[in-house]
Design a protein with these regions (language model features):
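Short hydrophobic core segments
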Residues: 34-37, 61, 203, 210-222, ...
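Dinucleotide-binding Rossmann-like beta1-alpha1 core, especially the glycine-rich loop
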Residues: 76-149, 293-295
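Helical element adjacent to the flavin cofactor pocket in flavoenzyme catalytic cores
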Residues: 160-206, 210
Length: 378
């Protein structure tokens, strides 16, 4: 599904928008050392990491425009530390490492990737509103301290305050990375693979065959291609987000469960789980519920208009963790899928894992956590 209605494209420069539709040349007969299939943030970050590691000629192909799917509909929040309340340790370790890689990219690339550093404040009626496990790097605030940061709450709240988290405009990050890739072709769909023994020897596309040295599938959900014997359980989960009109109300970064302060005095909120809704349309009742929920916590926001509203489908595996693995039975094919709510956050670390695996034959730490076979036979 191509995401429409999100704010992110409107924030881009003309040059950044042009990169999202970049198409360098035809693909028929191409023989890249590395072929990356998928032009969301994970695919683009992987292609960038492979090129940066000197893995040879790297080609990325994408069915539509870069970032047109779940990437373009994401909130772009980079908040590993709050995940300590909900995610297993290997996942949190990956998230922390990935935020550091976002910071590295911001420093290393001319103009950066659009990383914005900001703090996270989680609200609760009392500290037992958080899990008994108390994460590191958390400042526990009493209701008076919370009220100083967020005046006008509907009721006294305690809070968990975490500094130095981040966010990006996901399309800007894609455009900044993709601008430095050696070869990108949009508007080309992978349709099939040809396997000889334990190797992919050809990837069929809507524009002809490609013969890669290695291939990485980063297509959101696991690839479903003729000739590729791969069956990993997954689903897509719809979610809604919105951005408000400009307001003089300022939040101290991300305030959960209220909103995130973004540019131009606007607030970003939402991130629903609309399980069972397979329609591509924005549902007005869901948008109304989001705005009502925000106003119930912070009444000052009641009546604030909605400037942007959109929905997207996020890929999810049964355990809500991604797959980062070799394609079972093949020595020159990798895949990553099911990043669900953390694809933007985890893209650079996932890319680093894959490029290191390809170049040094070193799988990730705790490989079982990311295995394609953890659900049974693929």
């Amino acid at each position: 599904m191509t995401v429409t209605g999100a704010i992110w494209r409107d924030q881009l420069t003309a040059d950044e928008r042009a990169v999202l539709g970049r198409s360098d040349s035809g693909v028929a007969g191409a023989t890249p050392d590395v072929l990356v299939v998928g032009g969301g943030i994970v695919g683009v970050a992987t292609a960038f990491a492979c090129a940066d590691a000197g893995l040879g000629a790297v080609l990325l192909i994408e069915t539509g425009r870069l970032g047109a799917g779940a990437t373009g509909g994401a909130a772009g929040l980079l908040i590993p530390e709050p995940h300590q309340w909900s995610d297993p340790e290997p996942f949190v370790d990956l998230e922390r490492a990935s935020l550091e890689r976002w910071r590295d990219l911001q420093r290393a690339l001319p103009g950066g990737v659009g990383l914005v550093e900001l703090d996270w404040l989680g609200l609760a009626p009392h500290d037992s509103g958080f899990a008994a496990h108390q994460p590191r790097d958390v400042e526990w605030l009493n209701p008076g301290q919370v009220a100083e940061l967020v005046p006008g709450l509907a009721r006294p709240m305690e809070g968990a305050f975490i500094r130095r988290q981040g966010r990006v405009n996901p399309l800007r990050a894609v455009a900044r990375l993709a601008a430095r890739l050696p070869a990108v072709v949009t508007g080309v769909a992978a349709t099939s693979v040809t396997i000889s023994g334990d190797r992919v020897v050809s990837v069929g596309t809507s524009s002809g065959a490609i013969s890669p040295g290695v291939v990485v599938f980063a297509t959101g959900r696991p690839p479903m291609l003729d000739g590729l014997p791969l069956h990993i359980p997954s689903e897509r989960v719809k979610g809604h987000l919105l951005v408000t009109e400009r307001t003089g109300i300022r939040l101290p970064g991300i305030v959960a469960p209220v909103a995130t302060q973004i540019e131009d005095g606007r607030l970003l909120t939402g991130g629903t789980f609309d399980v069972g809704d397979e329609t591509p349309a924005v549902q007005p009742d869901v948008i109304d519920a989001i705005t009502a929920g925000v106003a119930a916590v912070l009444p000052r926001l009641r009546g604030l208009g909605v400037a942007y509203q959109w929905c997207c489908f996020r890929p999810r595996h049964p355990d809500s963790r991604p797959v980062i693995d070799k394609v079972p039975g093949l020595v020159n094919a990798w895949l990553t899928s099911g990043h669900f709510r953390t694809g933007i956050l985890n893209a650079p670390a996932t890319a680093a894992v894959l490029s290191r695996w390809m170049s040094q034959d070193v799988p990730p730490v705790d490989a079982r956590s990311w295995s394609a076979t953890r659900f049974g036979a693929p």
